[in-house]
Amino acid sequence: MSHVHQAGEAFASNAAESRQEIRNYTMNFGPQHPAAHGVLRLILEMDGETIMRADPHVGLLHRGTEKLAESKPFNQSIGYMDRLDYVSMMCNEHAYVRAIETLMGIEAPERAQYIRTMYDEITRILNHLMWLGSNALDLGAMAVMLYAFREREELMDCYEAVSGARMHAAYYRPGGVYRDLPDHMPKYKESRWHKGKALKQLNASREGSLLDFLENFTVEFPKRIDEYETLLTDNRIWKQRTVGIGVVTPELAHQWGMTGVMLRGSGVAWDLRKKRPYAKYDAVDFDIPLGKEGDCYDRYLVRVAEMRESNRIIKQCVAWLKANPGPVMVKNFKVAPPRREDMKDDMEALIHHFKLFSEGYCVPAGETYSAVEAPKGEFGCYLVSDGANKPFRVHLRAPGFAHLSSIDSIVRGHMLADVVAMIGTYDLVFGEVDR
């Protein structure tokens, strides 16, 4: 019996030593987690509920976009740009077409520049509404998602009105935009859900042109933002989940190459629309919202304020576009397709159209970097041409990639539940991170 007793004591002693040795454990967060915002895989080293280290794994959505763009004529790769950050479609297009225009030495007409400015801001609101709804849903505030998507639907209809597509528009073209703004808006049709007075009410703001619709939207949208703020800004639970969480100091933001809201939320007034104006941002009036503490709550406040500023810009663009009709594409027929009326009467115009969209055009040899202030930060396109009709090199700077690199230093010491809040406030889309 004494031998059995001694063996039991030895086993208990070894088990206790093993428990003392095993302090940290590893947890996989994603890529299937609903709060991973795509295909993010985080390998977390945990000490109880506290995060000791975070190792982000990327590449699960890598599609070789840069090499695909290098295998196509310049004007055939615009559609690939939409599929990078697939929540900020036209901003991606803008960086790419600006790079081509710089190499070719052409400038889009003034009306096209105002249209681009307006749609960049429509895209910013689309992105921030998606962010607001999904981040609030991740933290347990379900109603905000429904409110945000109500306005998002209206702006998606503005995409559809100019391009025929609700997401992948391919509306921006080197030298301008695909076509001028339409005189009508898509309308709801009668169905078992929409009929009678309800249908008329839905279509009341869609009787006029796209600009009329947007003019009405800019009047109503600030009231909608007030509704979001009523639900969240002073909400006790929302503040408990975001105040003091994921603090990014200005020094840390600079070290990690952060841009956009991640930088401005820390109090750094850097915005390409002000510092390096492009399109017509130097002709419109707007402010740069800034945070103070650099935490998740500040970044929420900055994004909400940015939606208000975007609304101001859209309002100014609508007023200018209503008063100033004009061309939306350069008259350089090396890059601009012939008019459809000409193609029906002139064989040369038909041949030119076919050659333009099958072979493209040769871009003078050179290199350039073109960047825009996308909703998530600085989205840039480095473009190298060797004089052929295809790019020699395309490199895309995705803001989310730089931001994700910093996640280990930001999440250390936080609780597991705070990871969801921090990933949400990064506003990641893996189409652009993995490219």
UniProtKB/Swiss-Prot annotation:
EC number, as in UniProt: 7.1.1.-
Q: Which reaction does it catalyse?
A: a quinone + NADH + 5 H(+)(in) = a quinol + NAD(+) + 4 H(+)(out)
Q: Which GO terms describe its cellular component?
A: plasma membrane
SUPFAM superfamilies listed in its UniProt record: HydB/Nqo4-like
Q: Name one GO molecular function term.
A: NADH:ubiquinone reductase (non-electrogenic) activity
Q: Which InterPro entries match?
A: NADH_Q_OxRdtase_suD, NADH_UbQ_OxRdtase_49kDa_CS, NDH1_su_D/H, NiFe-Hase_large
Q: Which UniProt keywords apply?
A: Cell membrane, Membrane, NAD, Quinone, Translocase, Transport, Ubiquinone
Membrane topology listed for this record: Peripheral membrane protein
Query: Where found?
Result: Cell membrane
One Pfam match, given by its short name, reads Complex1_49kDa
Give the top-rank taxon of the lineage listed in the UniProt record for this protein: Bacteria
Quaternary organization: NDH-1 is composed of 14 different subunits. Subunits NuoB, C, D, E, F, and G constitute the peripheral sector of the complex.
Cited function:
NDH-1 shuttles electrons from NADH, via FMN and iron-sulfur (Fe-S) centers, to quinones in the respiratory chain. The immediate electron acceptor for the enzyme in this species is believed to be ubiquinone. Couples the redox reaction to proton translocation (for every two electrons transferred, four hydrogen ions are translocated across the cytoplasmic membrane), and thus conserves the redox energy in a proton gradient.
**Family (UniProt):** Belongs to the complex I 49 kDa subunit family.
- The name this protein goes by in its record: NADH-quinone oxidoreductase subunit D
State the organism of origin: Stenotrophomonas maltophilia (strain K279a)
Q: What would be the name of the gene that encodes this protein?
A: nuoD
